[in-house]
Regions:
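Pyridoxal 5′-phosphate
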Residues: 1-249
Length: 249
């Protein structure tokens, strides 16, 4: 379709936990000369990310997803595309020359970094990226992957045993992230009870209201397991969830 100017796709769904075939999507888009932006907020945590092998035009993610400070993030983009893009914000250090007749902009990446940077937060990005990479390499990476597979199998089966529980996103190719609803239990009520038991979950639209509309719901409970979580913690979660459900019914 000639009206399509850019394709934006999640590497991994933040609601369903499903891993999208981004490389194939990129290949199809590039056949039509359409650039592709990949949202890597979940991908940077759970997947091996090689932007050159993926051949994406842009890859973005929040720093706090890999345990850096809040208010930080990464935007990777092809140089030729970034050079063609105008600055979206004005401020110090993003200009080269300024006159009444003409303004020229600084070289990349400065033209997109107007004003005083969040340098304290930025200092946390490098060690966070190194840590995220370490969690995916060698024996550590193998152990993390094996534990994630155990958690996925256990959680999928355990949630299926809860009466009235609907799990959204059950494809094999997924990460240990589980969004669900339980009949007779409002998501925010479950979240408050779980919080009292030391369990943190997310509820609401997850910034994906059209997807909620697709499933015919207004909210979900989301349990997201990270590389440092264990099968024992998944078992504790289910124990607490069953307790919360019994309190609400």
């Amino acid at each position: 379709d000639s009206r399509v100017k850019i394709v934006a796709v999640e590497h991994i769904s933040n609601v369903l936990g499903l891993i999208n075939p981004v490389k194939e999507i990129i290949q199809q888009a590039h056949k039509l000369n359409i650039p592709v932006l990949v949202d890597g907020a979940q991908g940077i945590v759970h997947a091996d990310v090689d932007v050159q092998e993926m051949d994406c035009d842009f890859y973005v993610f929040s720093g706090h997803k890999i345990y850096a400070a809040t208010g930080t993030g990464i935007l990777y983009g092809r140089r030729e595309l970034l050079e063609a893009m105008p600055p979206y914000m004005g401020g110090g250090d993003m200009v080269d020359t300024v006159s009444f007749a003409k303004t020229t902009y600084a070289e990349l990446p400065l033209k997109f970094e107007a004003g005083t940077p969040h340098f304290i937060g930025q200092a946390t990005l490098k060690p966070a990226l190194e840590f995220a990479k370490w969690l995916k390499e060698g024996e550590i990476g193998k152990a993390v992957k094996e534990e994630e597979e155990k958690i996925i199998e256990y959680m999928t089966n355990a949630l299926a045993q809860i009466e009235g529980c609907t799990l959204y996103g059950t494809a094999e190719n997924k990460i240990p992230l589980f969004s669900f609803n339980i009949e007779g239990c409002f998501p925010s009520d479950l979240a408050q009870l779980l919080d009292k038991m030391g369990v943190a979950v997310r509820t609401g639209f997850m910034c994906c209201e059209p997807l909620m509309t697709r499933f015919g719901v207004t909210s979900m409970v989301r349990a997201s397991f990270l590389p440092y979580n264990t099968l024992q913690e998944a078992e504790y979660f289910i124990k607490c969830l069953n307790r919360a459900v019994n309190m609400l019914r």
